Each structure stands twice: as C-alpha cells, then as structure tokens.
C-alpha cells in the first residue's frame, strides 16, 4: 500500500489531530483577546511586551499539557493503525476505535506507552548530540560551521520520527514485551541507518519546505487581520507560529510519519539484529540504556 493511499485512508486521524491542534489555537487566541482587552482597559498599548510574555507562557503550558496527554494517545492509535496498514495492507473501517483497542491491548496502561515514548525520544535526542560533538572538530574550518549546522538539522528531522517507527514495530511484535520490541526497534533503525537516512533526505527537505510555507502563509493572513484590528504584527507573528504548528502537527507530521514508517517497515522484517549494537547504543545514550534495562526486566519477568 502506497504512502499516499495510507494517508488518505487514515484521514480521520488527520482531522482529529487538526481538531486537537485548532482547539489549542482557539484557546490561545481567546487568551490573546483577553490580554489585549485588559491592556486597553488600563490604557496601555493594545498588547505590550509584558502581555505578550504572559500570553506566550500560558499558551505554551496549555499546548504542552494537551499534546502530552491527549495528543500522545491519539498519535499512538494512529501509529497502531498505520503499522497494520503497512504490514498487512488494510485499514479497518472503525480505525479510531480499533487503534485505541490496539494501544490498550499492547500497553495496558497509558503510563507504559508514555514511558516507552519518552525513553525512545530521549535516546534519539542524546544520539543526535553526538553529531554536534563531531561537528566541533570542524568548527575552525572556514565555511564548515554552516555545513555542520545543516547536518545537525537534517539528522534532527530525520531521527525525529524514530519513536513512531519503534512504536509501530511494537505492534508488529505482539509476542514480545513492549519495551523489548521498542528497544529492538531502535537497534533495527540504527542498524539500517545509512539506507534509511537516504530516504530521509527527501523527507527532510519536504518537512522544511512545507513547514515554512505553512508558517509564511499563516503569518501573512494573521498580520493582515491583526493590522485591521490594530493588534500589531508581533502578536500576529506569535499566533502564526501556533496556527502553523497545529497545521504541521495534523497534515505534515501525519504524512511524514507514514512515509518514514513505511520505509522502516520495509527493512525491519529482514533485519538480523547485531547484538553488539545494543552495547554501543547504551554507551552513547543513557536513555537507551534505561530502555534496554526495562527490556531485560521484561524478559526476566
């Protein structure tokens, strides 16, 4: 099943992600309007820097709380359905309910999924930092700083979807413990890193272009609206970041997630795991070591 086909067939998840993102956005806009109203009442500028700071902090807190709980479980259900679509070639009609049931069956409790996702994401961030350490070697070479910076950005985006791939792998290995399957999933990704990074090059360029377009178009529209309401362009710039983040979360991230998972699932079944890679990754990442320890705990139990 092609990436575009899976994307279209799982659009219900995309719309749910958009609804979630827009709910946060609308809440943020209401907060902005309240702060602007208070500023006008006290005779200050429409929205001064103090008001913008308060608004930005409150918006960030709301965004983090919603995405860390509701967003995580929605993503998990989406990943579960996509993993079946890639490996088995079908998408259930009641995909949302089926996805939730798969997550509940696989992880039992929400907490188990959150722990696994945090460990995988943390391991990815730590492994990404090794690129920065290598890049410091070339810091004195003229022009190399830009190359290293792009390389770090590229690696960051390319590895940013590993957690979805590893979570998807856990749904394909139902006979194994969730942490064991997740740990194996990370190892499989890095064992095939050269092949997968080649595919990720196109993905990275797509993410950069689409994210910029989402922000730029949103920014133009909101600047025009805020100027008409005399709210100033600074507020429009902040709002455009939130709105474009919601659009990216729903449309861009969903497509890239499916594309990355498909590339991963094509190589995962035929990969014979190199066991010394566990030890190497444990030395590079404390988070991966914690994940590996939990996997060993499952095997003992």
PLM regions and their residue ranges:
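Helix-coil boundary and N-terminal low-complexity module in membrane systems
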Residues: 1-211, 225-229, 234-235, 241-301
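Hydrophobic membrane-spanning alpha-helices of multi-pass integral membrane proteins
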Residues: 208-220
């Amino acid at each position: 099943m092609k990436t575009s086909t899976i994307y279209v067939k799982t659009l219900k998840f995309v719309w749910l992600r958009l609804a979630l993102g827009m709910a946060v956005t609308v809440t943020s806009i209401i907060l902005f309007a309240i702060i602007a109203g208070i500023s006008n009442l006290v005779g200050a500028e429409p929205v001064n820097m103090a008001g913008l700071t308060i608004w930005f902090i409150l918006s960030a807190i709301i965004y983090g709380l919603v995405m860390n709980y509701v967003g995580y479980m929605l993503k998990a259900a989406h990943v579960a359905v996509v993993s079946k679509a890639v490996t088995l070639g079908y998408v259930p009609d009641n995909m949302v309910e089926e996805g939730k049931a798969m997550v509940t069956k696989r992880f039992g409790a929400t907490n188990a999924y959150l722990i696994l996702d945090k460990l995988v994401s943390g391991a990815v961030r730590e492994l990404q930092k090794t690129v920065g350490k290598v890049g410091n070697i070339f810091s004195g070479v003229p022009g190399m700083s830009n190359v290293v910076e792009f390389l770090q950005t590229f690696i960051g985006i390319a590895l940013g979807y590993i957690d979805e791939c590893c979570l998807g792998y856990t749904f394909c290995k139902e006979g194994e413990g969730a942490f064991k399957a997740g740990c194996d999933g990370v190892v499989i990704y890095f064992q095939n890193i050269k092949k997968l990074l080649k595919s990720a090059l196109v993905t990275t360029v797509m993410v950069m272009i689409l994210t910029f377009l989402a922000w730029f178009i949103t920014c133009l529209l909101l600047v025009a609206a805020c100027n008409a309401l005399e709210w100033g362009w600074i507020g429009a710039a902040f709002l455009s970041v939130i709105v474009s983040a919601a659009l990216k979360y729903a449309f861009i991230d969903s497509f890239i997630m499916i594309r990355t998972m498909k590339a991963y699932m094509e190589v995962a079944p035929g990969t014979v795991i190199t066991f010394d890679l566990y030890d190497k990754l444990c030395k590079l990442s404390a988070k991966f070591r914690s994940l590996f320890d939990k996997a060993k705990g499952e095997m003992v139990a």
